[in-house]
Amino acid sequence: MLRSVVALLLFATATASVADNPETMAERSQSRAREVLDRAVAANGGAEALRAVKVVRLKLSGKTYPRLQMTTPAAPFEGGSFAETLLVDLEENRLRLEQEFGGFGFDGNNTIAIVDGAGSVYDNRARTITPIPAEQATQQQFIQYHRRLPNLLLRQALNNTNSLRYLGEDQFDGRRHEVVTFVMPDTQQVALYIDAQSGLISKYELIFVDSLTGEEASEIIFGDYQKVGNYQLPRRWQNRLAGEVNADYAAQAEINPAITDDSFRVAAAGYAEVKPVPTNLEEKVEELADGVHVIQNVAGQNQNSLAVGFADYVAVVEAPGSSDGADAVIKRIKELFPGKPIRYVAMTHHHGDHIGGMRSFIAEGATVITTAANRPVIEEMAAAKQNDRLSREPRKPQFLLLENGRRVLEDATRKLELINIGPNPHAREMVIAWLPAEKVVFQGDLFFVPNNDAPFGPPQPSTVSFAKKLRELGLTAERIAAVHGETATIEQFRGATATAD
């Protein structure tokens, strides 16, 4: 009897479902998305042609305008230069990536090669070879490069049709588009904008967390398509973050160029082999002197803050990372200085990775010490809607500005000087912290101690400018602590900058 009742209930439920909803919303969404995808695939030569792509070579070159990483917080901005050549063997999971870039105080010339699950990074400035950890040289890591070209994105969508969903119609660049989304093997959810007329992918979007405004869209825009054989290949490649142009490149793509094993070998005679960069840096507190601590890797990996104790309060220099990371840093500071309020938080410069935790310190009641030009960045950040402590406990930021390039905090126990040493090639306004009694400088992005055993290599333009300023100011530092990396001795710093003298 019980079995009959259960069967009857199941039949009634199924009958009601069929009558009320002959096809679920997810099924309808996937079915519509598949129709749109099939049209895009047909516009790019068809599924057979896309699956016949075995090798891709892509050259990108142009200007970069990295959001919250330029020399000034507001326009007009100075762009950087960038050139990249990517070679991917999709069948054998081989990759070679060459990049050259300049601007914002840094020059780079690197080559990455991955073959048979083993990879290395070749620093062509420092002439070093750094192994890539095995877990980062797997097929999974190749997936990100499928987002470089619309042809490879379509292949991925065809391989992941279960996650296809139709989002609707939208206008982009004055044209109607249908938008579908799918999930790639690296768990990134990608929204494809497919031109309703041509069937070509105009752009795709990812969602990222912006340190200034919270969740935003990252857009990769493809344009100026050219038909080459069966394929439509873009000749323009642009990245926008939060609506701002982040990179603008000319693109040159080749499908199935001839390759050999030598295509993935890197000539590196005379290069030094060094240890891999650790994938998980230890959270720790470094004591530079009584009441002077560098809180390392607590805000995030390779993200440090300086905490300086005074008689009645604590001053912090730098709030990197995120609100969650800053909450963890604040907890450590309270353990180091029980009963003392965090009265001040100073920032070295306006870049996003250096101010991502500022909202938590504002919520804590700390006054922000910065330059006049950087104040609007913090005001905008504090006003943004984010799911963090400041949203739950709203508070307007209070400011203490540098005057004539300096701000000094001092009582009977300690003296801390905040000095604007800009303009620096990395940022026009660049503040360092100087503890004269302890002979310690704390800085951000001006000098790095590698997290492995790699040599320093030729000094970067930002470091050369920093060394010159230290001499001009007569700061007799013995140690140079950093927002990124370990604390350096003055001997290390002098050795690394000797070629710049």
Predicted features, each with a name:
Residues R28, E35-T128, S163-G168, S323:
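N-terminal mature ectodomain segment of secretory-pathway/periplasmic proteins
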Residues S29-E35, A42, V115-V190, A196-L200, ...:
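Flexible, processing/modification-adjacent segments and terminal tails
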Residues F172-V266, V431-P436, Q443-G444, V449-P450, ...:
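Gly/Pro-enriched, hydrophobic low-complexity segments
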Residues D248-F310, R407:
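Zn-dependent metallo-beta-lactamase
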Residues E287-I333, M430-V449:
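Conserved beta-strand hairpin/beta-sheet module of binuclear metal-dependent hydrolase folds
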Residues D324-I369, E472-T476:
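Active-site metal-binding motif and surrounding structural segment of the metallo-beta-lactamase
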Residues A467-D501:
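Divalent-metal (often Zn2+) His-rich catalytic cores of metallo-beta-lactamase-fold enzymes
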